[in-house]
């Protein structure tokens, strides 16, 4: 990047190291900001002992990572793979994916969703949540702006001021009691203002606690995870799990009888 030109030496050296341990690549995919010119492709092909047509440039995309499959198809990477494996495979229909990317790049309107959590400062802490919101937004021709709200800040301040005017509030899963009261206040703010609310795992639990306290008048209602002595345990462990000391790997996944 500093020299303003593509350097092929790192690729050649990486492939040489692979060949030293007996791995000969059939295809070399080069991550690059720009396309590879034919001279660089031929140089990589020659020094890596890979066919010229099997040198693929994986360029930076303009808008979203979801453009990558379409760019790779444009470079015929799918055909290279099936040809090298000797598989007779029909050309896939990517029209649904193309439509999704088009909606993602050219939204018709915008929405703001507040995500209230205690790991907001960590970029990837709620990565799957953020990506799910982006995908859901594209399905509805919407660009989703995410307002990251620290639940502990709500405890020390005012929910209406901190959360503000948003189109929806989402509280993701989590464990422990740190920041829990801020999440309960966020759920209350959503209920009293009519803002759409989605609670996932712990987010559903805090909505239950909030409703129990402020609508059902169950003072001190809580989950037994956060307050074992709560007078109103509206969320509790299953009877068969109450004796478990190590809570790791006890989360129920998938369908099961209840």
Predicted regions and their residues:
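N-terminal beta1-alpha1 cap of cysteine-dependent amidohydrolase-like domains
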Residues: 1-258
């Amino acid at each position: 990047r500093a020299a303003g030109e593509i350097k092929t030496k790192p690729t050649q050296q990486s492939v040489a190291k692979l060949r030293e341990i007996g791995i000969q690549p059939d295809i070399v995919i080069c991550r690059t900001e720009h396309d590879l010119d034919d001279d660089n492709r031929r140089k990589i092909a020659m020094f890596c002992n890979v066919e010229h047509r099997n040198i693929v440039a994986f360029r930076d995309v303009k808008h979203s990572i979801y453009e990558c499959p379409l760019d790779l198809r444009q470079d015929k990477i799918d055909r290279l793979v099936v040809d090298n494996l000797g598989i007779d495979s029909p050309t896939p229909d990517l029209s649904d994916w193309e439509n999704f990317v088009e909606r993602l790049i050219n939204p018709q309107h915008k929405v703001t969703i507040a995500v209230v959590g205690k790991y907001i400062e960590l970029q990837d802490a709620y990565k799957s949540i953020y990506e799910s919101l982006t995908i859901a937004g594209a399905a509805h021709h919407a660009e989703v702006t995410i307002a990251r709200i620290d639940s502990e800040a709500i405890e020390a301040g005012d929910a209406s001021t901190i959360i503000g005017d948003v189109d929806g509030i989402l509280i993701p899963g989590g464990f422990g009691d740190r920041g829990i009261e801020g999440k309960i206040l966020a759920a209350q703010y959503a209920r009293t203002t009519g803002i759409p609310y989605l609670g996932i795992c712990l987010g559903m639990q805090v909505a239950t606690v909030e409703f129990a306290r402020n609508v059902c008048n169950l003072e001190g209602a809580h989950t037994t995870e956060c307050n074992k002595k709560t007078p109103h345990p509206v969320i509790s462990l299953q009877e068969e799990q109450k004796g478990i000391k190590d809570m790791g790997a006890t989360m129920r996944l998938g369908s099961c009888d209840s």
